[in-house]
Design a protein with these regions (language model features):
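C-terminal beta-strand-rich structural cap/linker in extracellular carbohydrate-active enzymes
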Residues: 522-545
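Central antiparallel beta-sheet cores of small beta-barrel/beta-sandwich binding domains
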Residues: 40-138, 144-153
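Glycan-recognition surfaces
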Residues: 288, 331, 335-430, 451
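Structural recognition of the beta-strand scaffold that forms the well-ordered cores
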Residues: 187-193, 222-228, 264-269, 299-304, ...
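N-terminal secretory signal peptides that target proteins for export/translocation
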Residues: 1-14
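Aromatic-lined carbohydrate-binding/catalytic grooves of carbohydrate-active enzymes
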Residues: 195, 205, 209-313
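Carbohydrate-binding surface patches
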Residues: 418-421, 426-428, 464-503, 534
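Bacterial N-terminal signal peptides
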Residues: 17-29
């Protein structure tokens, strides 16, 4: 049975190249392989005697000067062909099957159920198949791949089994507690490139976002980090130092520019051999890369698990050790660098993330710009809210506000919920083209104040009836923030009784609507109002004087 794996060349929801499409994250055990290709085999085979059994590699050049290599394995029995797309997101590949007719092979993957937290899909929802049309040409395979209605093409050549394997396992360090770096005592606020730009991000784009962060008023509202996500990397030089690709000719100069705007600069890497998009990562070079990041002026590191999953089993102990290694390295640089753990909530990271030196940790799979994704992720966070404390935050992923996939009411719910959760507020839209409505949501000072409250107290569930929920969070000044949420598809009444709010039931002061920016008159034993579809009413109840 084939259980070997190779480098992952896919990134969440991105299908702009064949390498990304081939290795879309549909995880299953690959079929058995009857025979392995001999190393270097490249003989031309006639259609009548073609034998596709073996390992294949697709190398796709990109404008940034990098190549992404995607691997797959095939087994041929007569005209029937089975195999697997190999990736580094798990110890298994994605099964494919098809029939060879002359020189043409039609391969498909079976539609698979999405795991909980998968971007844009509900747990158990079917993911679309990958369709690969293959033509034999002089011992090579010309591929045309379609996934999520996107089609692209490339040529694959034979390779060896060894080429598909991850590098040898480096022993992990013994566990210990990394000292607190005393950073981000309230949740970090900023911007990240991935949600809007993904692999297209360039030096010029980042400079433009820094400019817009200031000119739009975002910086004044508290957003300070400008974070470059994946696809800036190239390779390593003769001394093992990580280098940047053509899109980022001088990373230190870019960081200096961001700093000149009064902002802070963030970067991305992975503990595996490659990042989620298939670029050079920090495996075996943690201390060296941390020093490089510090020398460039990096203030924030997002560290994405990605290909490390194929080297180390994802036990809580292994995950903690993986992230501890970079946590130690960052602190040894002497530069204050916010440490963002991104391992999708595996191993109950909220229980040990702070021990690695982490300041924030992703608690779920990737978010997407759709109500179902945001709703599922956001409302799943209440139970783990007690794990937050100053400098250490649950991270339900970046904000999608302004990207166009949700209504204004849904975006207000997004902002309200993340703020009640004391989640990092990392915008993911194009800051240059924000509408007034988007600005009013992202820069609502009264809502931001909820997120940034210094008490760092957890949110609590007050009431849950059908598709409506009432959440409550105490503030440092003695006030209480109450969120009335309607998760249903129709407008609905949502309310609470004062007796459900222990800190406010005896008597209370002014009640303020944080979205309407006006006081609300409440009399009697409680409050109820009609909340629009997927909407929210966010109230701040002052303590009585």
């Amino acid at each position: 049975m084939i259980a070997d794996v190779a480098r992952l060349m896919a990134r969440k929801g991105s299908a702009r190249s064949l390498s990304l499409l081939l290795l879309a994250a549909l995880l299953a055990t690959p079929p058995a392989v009857r025979a392995e290709a001999a190393p270097g085999q490249a003989a031309t085979q006639a259609a009548s005697s073609a034998n596709l059994t073996g390992y294949w590699v697709l190398r796709v050049p990109h404008d940034d000067g990098t190549f992404r290599s995607s691997y797959f394995q095939l087994e041929q029995s007569g005209d029937a062909v089975t195999g697997a797309l190999l990736n580094n997101s798990s110890a298994n590949g994605t099964p494919v099957s098809g029939t060879l007719v002359g020189k043409h092979l039609h391969l498909t993957t079976a539609a698979a159920s999405s795991p909980a937290g998968a971007a844009g899909t509900a747990a158990g929802a079917p993911r679309p198949s990958i369709v690969i049309e293959v033509t034999l040409e002089d011992g090579k395979l010309s591929l045309q791949t379609t996934y999520r209605q996107r089609t692209t093409a490339g040529v694959a050549e034979r390779t060896t089994r060894e080429a598909t394997l991850p590098p040898p396992m480096i022993p992990l360090p013994a566990l210990h507690d990394v000292a607190d770096n005393n950073l981000v005592r309230t949740p970090p606020m900023g911007w990240n490139s991935w949600n809007k730009f993904a692999g297209r991000i360039t030096d010029a784009d980042v400079r433009a976002m820094a400019d817009a962060m200031v000119s739009s008023g975002m910086a004044k509202a508290g957003y300070v980090y400008i974070n470059v996500d994946d696809t800036w990397e190239l390779d390593r030089d003769a001394n093992g130092n990580i280098t940047t690709n053509k899109k980022f000719p001088d990373m230190k100069a870019l960081a200096d520019y961001v700093h000149s705007k009064g902002l802070k600069f963030g970067l991305y890497s992975s503990p595996g051999p490659t990042t989620c998009a298939g670029y050079m990562a920090s495996y075996g070079h943690e201390a060296q890369d941390a020093k490089t990041f510090a020398s460039w002026g990096v203030d924030y590191l997002k560290y994405d698990l990605c290909s490390a999953r194929t080297i180390y089993p994802s036990t809580p102990e292994n995950l903690q050790a993986i992230y501890q290694k970079m946590g130690d390295a960052l602190q040894q640089t002497g530069r204050p660098i916010v440490y963002s753990l991104c391992e999708y909530g595996q191993g109950d990271v909220w229980k040990w993330g702070a021990k690695t030196g982490g300041n924030l940790w992703r608690t779920t799979g990737d978010i997407s710009d759709h109500w179902a994704s945001m709703d599922r992720i956001g409302f799943s966070q209440v139970d783990i809210s007690p794990y937050i404390r100053a400098g250490h935050w649950n991270d339900p992923d970046m904000l999608e506000i302004g990207n166009g996939g949700m209504t204004a009411d849904e975006y207000r719910t997004h902002m309200s919920l993340w703020s009640m959760l004391a989640a990092p507020l990392i915008a993911g839209n194009d800051l240059r083209t924000m509408t007034d409505e988007t600005k009013s949501i992202l820069m609502n000072a009264e809502v931001i104040a909820v997120d940034q409250d210094p008490a760092a107290k957890p949110v609590e569930m007050v009431a849950h009836e059908g598709t409506t929920e009432v959440l409550m969070r105490p503030m440092a000044d003695g006030s209480v923030v109450i969120g009335l949420y309607n998760r249903g598809s129709e407008a609905a009444p949502v309310g609470f009784q004062w007796k459900q709010i222990p800190s406010a039931q005896a008597k209370h002061g002014t009640v303020r609507d944080l979205w309407k920016h006006e006081d609300v008159k409440i009399s009697g034993n409680g409050y109820s109002t009609t909340v629009p579809t997927h909407g929210v009413v966010l109230l701040r109840v002052a303590s009585a004087k």
